[in-house]
Amino acid sequence: MENYVDFAVQKAVELLAIDSPTGYTAEAEEFVLREFRALGFAAERTAKGGILIDLGGESTDDALLLEAHADTLGGMVAEIKGDGRLRIVNVGGMNANNAEAENCRVVTKFSGSYEGTLQLINASVHVNGDYASTKRSWDTVEVVLDEAVESADDVKALGISVGDFVCFEPRTRVTKSGYIKSRFLDDKLSVGILLGFAKYLHDEGKTPTRRVYAHVTVYEEVGHGGSASVPAGVTEAISVDMGCVGAGLQCTERQVSICAKDSGGPYSYDVVKKLIAAAQKEHADYAVDIYPYYGSDVEATLRAGYDIRHGLIGAGVYASHGYERSHRDGVLNTLRVLRGYLF
């Protein structure tokens, strides 16, 4: 699978360059649709905007669904303030603590986009004596537009209005040592991994014995991405989403994480065991962990009433929902587990 790591990382980098906070995902949807079709696979856009791909396979009675998501965290304009600054609310789990001082774009509905920065209100240390002690929250930060605006009317004249999306700069970098740093690796890195796996199937002429579908969802960050569009015959679903890295967990950015349990409860025991067996068969560097604060697309699938077994794997990602970090080795090990699970 080493031959497909560069492709997977490159496609993730390309997708990371496309703004796609939940609710504003059309360009990302088109990218995913185009890339899977370019590899020769049948792909279609669902009514919700997700991309459903048929990756081939023989038996349709025991089909497998792989799920990843292209939507990310972000913000939305909630108020145009009298001084021309913007009060925003978070979309998904965007956190004001790590979004402070980040460049962003305000995407208007009809008048293009405008650059700005998320700053603490009264952000100058030499002026604000409470700078260090102020708790960062969505009530204490604001978007400062890079436009000559001094009033709400000035901002409205640009075409900015309540409900416009605020997209944060991902700052994507791939280091010479193989580390991948960016906002929104959750879960665009996994979309790149699924594209890399699709390229492996295409280039190697591999046909799984069971039918395999992929669903790239666009509402995962708000909880209902995987709740629809499960093809007939699917009996198992596996989320390919970021693996947690942090205190009390075993996984590193260079490994593939196999989740045994998260906030929604245990994953299917049989699926977890098969994922571990696949990792061992492929000599993948893996860790099994419990994620204390986490939910996935496949749990949305279950809650929607689908009768399936479920699992979750993903490349280890540190600093989740912030400026995240993973590694090429994590990508490789995830690809290895996918191959071992199906072949």
Where are these predicted regions, by residue range?
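N-terminal hydrophobic/helix-forming segments and targeting peptides
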Residues: M1-F343
